């Protein structure tokens, strides 16, 4: 299935690229989410006519993501969880907990933007967490996990 991308898609292509994808990926994700349109002559002509509009929208989204990344630069948050005397948490601190903690201190963050490479935290300590705010914008923040008896 050939599609024209209306925005940048990680590991696939950039705005305006004509890509070939498996039919299920195109029908079930790219087309319903408005990320791509079928690569027909009419759609190609319509895309060329609106290309400047799409590029302006992509630039504004990138600028907004960079502004958010600047707010997160050097930010840290403390998350409290029940822990044993050895420092092991009785549960874990995951992406949802981190997103809620940042939102509580006035830095809105969604769970899907938090990247935990090695899974949820199960020990007390300080961790560096990657935030994926846009396809081209990432930021690193510090999360301090404190234990409460």
Curated annotation (Swiss-Prot):
InterPro entries hit by this protein: Ribosomal_bL9, Ribosomal_bL9/RNase_H1_N, Ribosomal_bL9_bac/chp, Ribosomal_bL9_C, Ribosomal_bL9_C_sf, Ribosomal_bL9_N, Ribosomal_bL9_N_sf
GO biological process terms held by the UniProt record: translation
Keyword Ribosomal protein (UniProt): yes
Cellular component GO terms, alphabetical: ribonucleoprotein complex; ribosome
Keywords, ordered alphabetically: Ribonucleoprotein, Ribosomal protein, RNA-binding, rRNA-binding
GO molecular-function terms, A-Z: rRNA binding; structural constituent of ribosome
Protein family per UniProt: Belongs to the bacterial ribosomal protein bL9 family.
Function: Binds to the 23S rRNA.
HAMAP family in the cross-refs: Ribosomal_bL9
Protein name: Large ribosomal subunit protein bL9
Organism listed in the record: Xylella fastidiosa (strain Temecula1 / ATCC 700964)
């Amino acid at each position: 299935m050939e599609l024209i991308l209306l925005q940048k898609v990680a590991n696939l292509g950039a705005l305006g690229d004509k890509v070939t994808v498996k039919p299920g990926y195109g029908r079930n994700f790219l087309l319903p989410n408005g990320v791509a349109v079928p690569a027909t002559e009419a759609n190609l002509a319509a895309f060329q006519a609106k290309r400047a509009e799409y590029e302006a929208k992509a630039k504004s989204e990138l600028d907004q993501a960079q502004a958010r990344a600047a707010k997160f630069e050097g930010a840290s948050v403390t998350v409290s969880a029940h822990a044993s005397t050895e420092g092991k948490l009785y549960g874990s601190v995951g992406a949802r907990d981190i997103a809620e903690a940042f939102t509580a201190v006035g830095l809105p963050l969604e769970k899907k933007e938090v990247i935990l490479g090695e899974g949820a935290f199960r020990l007390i300590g300080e961790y560096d967490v990657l935030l994926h705010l846009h396809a081209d914008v990432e930021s690193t923040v510090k999360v301090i996990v404190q234990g409460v008896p």
